[in-house]
Amino acid sequence: MSQEEILQKVCSIVSEQLSVESAEVKSDSNFQNDLGADSLDTVELVMALEEAFDIEIPDEAAEGIATVGDAVKFIEEKKG
């Protein structure tokens, strides 16, 4: 899976989970500051990403994922 494919899939999931227009979701979008996510939204988003990409995101790692780009980078590293 290429970085672009991961980015598109992450953006789609973020858009759906946070009920925002897909055009608003960019690589540098911060989940809380730019997209209006609260802490519960963030937990649900992490769970959705884990399911969609069949990976596990430990709590420590999840705390470091603040933007769409952070999520893409983490998934890329996990999927190798």
Curated annotation (Swiss-Prot):
It comes from the Bacteria. It is found in: Cytoplasm. Residues 4-79 form the Carrier domain. It comes from Prochlorococcus marinus subsp. pastoris (strain CCMP1986 / NIES-2087 / MED4). The keyword Thylakoid does not apply. HAMAP family: Acyl_carrier. One of its GO terms (cellular component) is cytosol. Carrier of the growing fatty acid chain in fatty acid biosynthesis. Pathway: Lipid metabolism; fatty acid biosynthesis. One of its GO terms (molecular function) is acyl binding. 4'-phosphopantetheine is transferred from CoA to a specific serine of apo-ACP by AcpS. This modification is essential for activity because fatty acids are bound in thioester linkage to the sulfhydryl of the prosthetic group. SUPFAM superfamilies: ACP-like (SSF47336). Transmembrane segments: none annotated. InterPro entries: ACP, ACP-like_sf, PP-bd_ACP, Ppantetheine_attach_site. PROSITE patterns: CARRIER, PHOSPHOPANTETHEINE. The modification O-(pantetheine 4'-phosphoryl)serine is found at S39. GO terms for biological process: lipid A biosynthetic process. The keyword Transcription regulation does not apply. Belongs to the acyl carrier protein (ACP) family. Keywords: Cytoplasm, Fatty acid biosynthesis, Fatty acid metabolism, Lipid biosynthesis, Lipid metabolism, Phosphopantetheine, Phosphoprotein. It holds the Pfam family PP-binding. This is Acyl carrier protein.
